[in-house]
């Protein structure tokens, strides 16, 4: 009897194994469940005998189970476990329990959160995670690249605070308060920085005085939006869960700092609301340290005048932060906060409209590289070395991708402006999704045989469906989902190519599949909204030749194919 049961169990497991290229034959929820089971099997702590921690490695080789390591310049190795880079996975695990009825995934996610609060929260409230801190899964000790001074940093990470508050609201509150306390250097002028100091004593926080400064005032701290986004998001969630009015005031105040300097004519910008304080004279254009002043002014100022500032540079990468990551986050906060979020909605939608009006070229579905005043930099040759490239480099228009399709589709649900729809329509067509119509459901011809396998496209199509209830958009999303499973579900993990050495446990493909399944089951609230957030690890990394590779990012490790090694990046 036992033998028969064992054989039956093995046959069931065999049925659940889905070879690449055949995965569409099985339902999506089973695929996501199998994926998460594989993560828990291969990325878990196997180093501590019968008392393992609940923590997970960030990356794993699906073929061998080898967990991805960080190699420090002195040769030390650490199995990378950066909780800030696992927040999409936490949302997947929670959503999977909601849809499947199996509580084990939610429980594991809760255990991971609880373990971090119990073991990796310092006395200031900060967690050992982010751009320059992580846990070595082998030793369970906090690690970090020494040349980065082991500072705290979150940039577009958007932690799953809903889960964190449900596990330990007091510890989550301590973190958010500590986060702001460490990253606001001067509350009077709201000088912020992406780097925060661990162990900093708590200051006056929300009780601090504030004096509004003129646009682009000079500070030592760099007010990058990708760092500001996480501050805005965290304080807004503190208000949502704890009704902390001071947190809301400062969250909206910080968000407003990125709105006030927008160009008066175009409404574009800004990526920073300050400019770097010049503390030394540069001797080399190629040395782009912020102590020499605003990097855009140094490189573009002689030709374009005082408006050429870092905050005003509407270039590839910066615009993704502005009009995708920031937009998605603030659109969601606008919903979550009710009437208190109306300002955030207006600021966000107005910004997307401005970018559509001045930046979008529907003829070839590209965005123009620009200065916020509308100065088109398309095909501009850089006259000198600098922060934005070497002398002789040419700035080119860049494709409007699915990350923008999501934000424009979601914004259309808030404001049915044809300008927003025009951008969404152009991107969808260029991405091989067909014609989504002159308006929702009108004159459309979606491509139900599309080969698109981009999870961003799937999320965007669900947003189009949610905004319009036009069934064809969700049918198209199902086709994209099938393509994702056929082309990206490899050896039980999601990877862009079967040649990749490591799979990222924070992959968004299962997140997108789960969101679709929730929609089809009429349970959209079962899966957390997608905000396009992601954590990262950055620091010096030991090369095969014994040299130290400066400013190495974990995503570069995830891009390596089997047998490849990191190549020099030329950074000093």
UniProtKB/Swiss-Prot annotation:
Q: Does the keyword Transport apply?
A: no
Give GO MF terms, alphabetically: pectate lyase activity
Domain of life of the source:
Bacteria
Instruction: Please name the Pfam families in this protein's record.
Output: Pectate_lyase_2
One GO cellular component term noted in the UniProt record for this chain: periplasmic space
Q: Taking the first listed entry, what is the main subcellular location of this protein, grouped into a coarse class?
A: periplasm
Q: What name goes with this protein?
A: Periplasmic pectate lyase
What species is this protein from? Answer: Yersinia pseudotuberculosis serotype I (strain IP32953)
């Amino acid at each position: 009897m036992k033998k028969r049961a064992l054989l039956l169990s093995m046959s069931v497991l065999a049925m659940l194994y889905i070879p690449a290229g055949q995965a569409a034959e099985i339902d999506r929820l089973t695929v996501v469940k199998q994926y998460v089971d594989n993560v828990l099997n291969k990325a878990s702590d196997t180093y501590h005998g019968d008392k393992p921690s609940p923590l997970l490695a960030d990356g794993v080789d699906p073929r061998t189970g080898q967990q991805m390591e960080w190699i420090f310049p002195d040769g030390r190795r650490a199995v990378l476990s950066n909780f800030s880079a696992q927040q999409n996975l936490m949302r997947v695990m929670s959503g999977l329990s909601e849809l499947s009825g199996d509580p084990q995934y939610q429980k594991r996610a809760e255990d991971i959160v609880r373990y971090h609060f119990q073991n990796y929260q310092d006395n200031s409230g900060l967690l050992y995670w982010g751009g320059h801190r992580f846990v070595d899964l082998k030793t369970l000790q906090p690690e970090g690249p020494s040349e980065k001074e082991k500072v705290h940093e979150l940039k577009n990470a958007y932690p799953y605070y809903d889960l964190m508050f449900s596990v330990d609201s007091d510890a989550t509150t301590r973190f958010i308060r500590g986060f702001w306390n460490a990253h606001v250097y001067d509350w009077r002028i709201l000088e912020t920085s992406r780097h925060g100091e661990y162990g900093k004593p708590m200051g006056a926080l929300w009780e601090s005085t504030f004096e509004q400064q003129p646009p682009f005032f000079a500070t030592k701290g760099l007010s990058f939006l990708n760092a500001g986004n996480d501050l805005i998001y965290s304080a807004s969630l503190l208000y949502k869960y704890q009704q902390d009015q001071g947190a809301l005031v400062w969250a909206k105040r910080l968000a407003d700092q990125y709105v006030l300097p927008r160009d008066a004519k175009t409404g574009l910008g800004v990526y920073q609301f300050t400019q770097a304080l010049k503390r030394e004279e540069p001797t080399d254009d190629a040395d782009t340290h912020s102590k020499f002043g605003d990097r855009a002014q140094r490189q573009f100022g002689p030709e374009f005048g005082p408006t050429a500032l870092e905050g005003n540079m509407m270039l590839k990468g910066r615009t993704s932060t502005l009009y995708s990551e920031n937009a998605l986050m603030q659109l969601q906060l606008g919903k979550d906060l009710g009437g208190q979020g109306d300002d955030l909605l207006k600021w966000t939608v107005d910004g997307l409209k401005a970018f559509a009006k001045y930046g979008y070229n529907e003829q070839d579905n590209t965005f123009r590289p620009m200065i916020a005043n509308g100065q088109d930099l398309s095909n501009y040759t850089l006259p000198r070395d600098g922060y934005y490239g070497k002398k002789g480099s040419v700035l080119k228009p860049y494709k409007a991708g699915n990350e923008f399709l999501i934000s424009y589709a979601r914004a259309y649900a808030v404001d049915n402006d044809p300008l927003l729809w025009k951008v969404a329509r152009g991107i969808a067509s260029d991405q091989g999704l067909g014609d989504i119509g002159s308006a929702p459901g009108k004159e459309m011809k979606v491509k139900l045989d599309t080969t698109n396998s981009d999870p961003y496209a799937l999320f965007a199509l669900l947003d189009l469906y949610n905004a319009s209830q036009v069934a064809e958009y969700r049918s198209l999303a199902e086709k994209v989902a099938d393509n994702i499973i056929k082309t990206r579900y490899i050896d039980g993990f999601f990877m862009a190519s079967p040649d990749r050495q490591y799979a990222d446990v924070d992959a968004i493909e299962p997140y997108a599949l789960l969101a679709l399944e929730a929609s089809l089951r009429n349970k959209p609230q079962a899966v957390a909204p997608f905000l396009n957030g992601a954590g990262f690890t950055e620091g010096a990394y030991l090369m095969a030749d014994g040299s130290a590779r400066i400013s190495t990012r974990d995503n570069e490790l995830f891009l390596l194919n089997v047998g490849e090694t990191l190549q020099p990046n030329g950074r000093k």
